[in-house]
């Protein structure tokens, strides 16, 4: 036990005194929004399997493979193209109908590049719908061609140099202009640098050829492997030139150089394989730091099984250590989940993982270089929760009195101390809203947006009166009767007034009638 502690102390001292960078993947944010992990949740990053053939003879030779170029990060943009149309239907009888519509268009490479440049410069404008242009007795369209740019990071397949995202039709893309499942949307990486395929570096590796005890007569009897090629069956291998060099194209599309001097039991190795089909392409063997990290993890840890074992512990309500939590973390840049323990409950949060270079698995300050090994040290994490007398960060990262420790990478280097073995009870949460969340919204629900932008049509307003003929007939009958009654009253009132007046009676006087005023005057 004393010797073990002594060796651990020596290794810790070595890490403290050296400054070689270790590449890891870590969340790009310093804080995350955590939510409880519900019971039954189980997600693990997958890893490749190694199938080794026993009882085979082995021959080894030195070969060169193209290293390729690993994408520096997973940042990129979604480029949307659309035609925004304002339509004015100006009827001959006066009203104007204004409608708006959006029509999808396939963006071009030049349009997307120009839109991204404008977006980064802060000059990309979203004008919206154009103002209407109305011509009498005609239908007129006003159009704007709109380019929208949305930041969208994707995953990186280090082994093949592909972009990986569910938006891609085949879930992967290896060009600088990637189609998506939406015809009007394309994805382009942030870094648009181009490289000559033959200008890349070729690195020497040791390739082993395994074959039966009897003399092989064809390539299908062989199996090739190296520390970067786990198990390559010969029946899927063919010979072809790459950058004017002889070699073999493996079943996974990668290429290794094989010279004419490489012999296998007095036969040239190349002669055992058929020629590749015309037009065959090759993939680079990416010996970048990202791949070395992935291989280093795969060699020392069975990622998938260890992750599943952690979930089994959670289901059995067994205590977990910081190392157990580290097995749940993603291994490559892109989208992923981060995990932490809060008050005895397992919490998770969606995160964007990026490449980070740290000086050692044990740091005095939680700082590292993002996106480049030659970058500037920045703070990696600021959100800590209590954990058995220590403080816990994402995916098992722990803060102790002796420094900040990354359990996964300490374990990969053979450094195990008491802090990594501290256990804590962790349980998933049965969220009370789960039954409610499973309800579906009624399909009969309608949303009314109104008739804004449409002038009233007098003809349609009048025709609307006749939508119900019974009510209309009753209304017209009532109106006619009302008019007749009014006219009748107007004619009847004068007659009534005349009857009420008294007639003047004229009386005749005999004496006065016989009186002649002229005779009286002459007298």
UniProtKB/Swiss-Prot annotation:
Lipidation sites (S-palmitoyl cysteine): 497
Pfam families membership: PH_Rhabdo_glycop (PF24834), Rhabdo_glycop_CD (PF24833), Rhabdo_glycop_FD (PF00974)
Signal peptide (residue range): 1-20
Protein's membrane topology: Single-pass type I membrane protein
Annotated site, pH sensor in the pre-fusion state, chain positions: 80, 182, 431
Region called Trimerization, residue ranges: 262-316, 391-413
Sugar-bearing residue positions: 183, 343
Name of protein: Glycoprotein
Taxonomic lineage from the root: Viruses, Riboviria, Orthornavirae, Negarnaviricota, Haploviricotina
